[in-house]
Amino acid sequence: MKKLLLLLVLTFSITCFAQEEKWSYPILPGTEAWIAFDTYQEKVNACQIPEDVLKTTSTSDLLDLCLAYPLLLDIYAFNEMSDGFNAYYSNFNGIREFMTRTDAVEALRERYQEELGQQESLLNNAVVTLIEKGDYVFRVSAIEMFLGCPQLQSNLSSSTQKEIVKNLLTGYEKKHESLSVFTGLGFHANVYARANIVNKLDPTLLLKAKNKNITRLLKGVNDDAGSVEKLDQISYSLIKE
């Protein structure tokens, strides 16, 4: 009996350790190993998640890895957000795996709500550094980008898409509560996401707006207040249906 009990304790301990041990990126920006890379492709290669880890990592943990991807910020190195996201999608096996998960939308919406829930306490906290606030803004924007990307939208029902638009509008309104922090790039991902979902739901909606710049929102080019205003009107009308 004692031997059986000991065996159960050991098995439980090993299982718990395996559950707690999570994969992390072995080489990070700023380290000597990272600085030693000669090419961008070497950095991309170093950030790939091993196949066995990809298949065994939970969707929630995989989302964490996608948000922690060392080259994620490079999305903004492109003139158009859509090009930046497509490069990220092409270069990183983690986001490609994430988009195949049947519970990807659920994980994204849950995480988005969590992030929005801590916005006020985080951004209004004098102890929180500007770097930490910047990380928060970028993290929220990345989640919005994921929610609206065509790779995710292709397999969603119209009802789910409308629910996501509703979530994004909640985030849009929350961001307006902290304009000093989100002004500029802080709104681009939200607009990009909603534009792509609206276009997937009904491509004629953007065309009916009769604004020559509104389709530019599909690429993440948010430089025309009139087109954003039209998109806002369309978005709010969708969630009232």
Identify what each model region corresponds to.
Residues 14-18:
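Sec/Tat signal peptide C-region and signal peptidase I cleavage site
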Residues 4, 21-22:
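Short hydrophobic "helix-edge" motifs at membrane interfaces and signal-peptide entry regions
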Residues 4-13:
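Sec-dependent N-terminal signal peptides
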Residues 19, 25-241:
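Non-catalytic all-alpha helical scaffold/repeat segments
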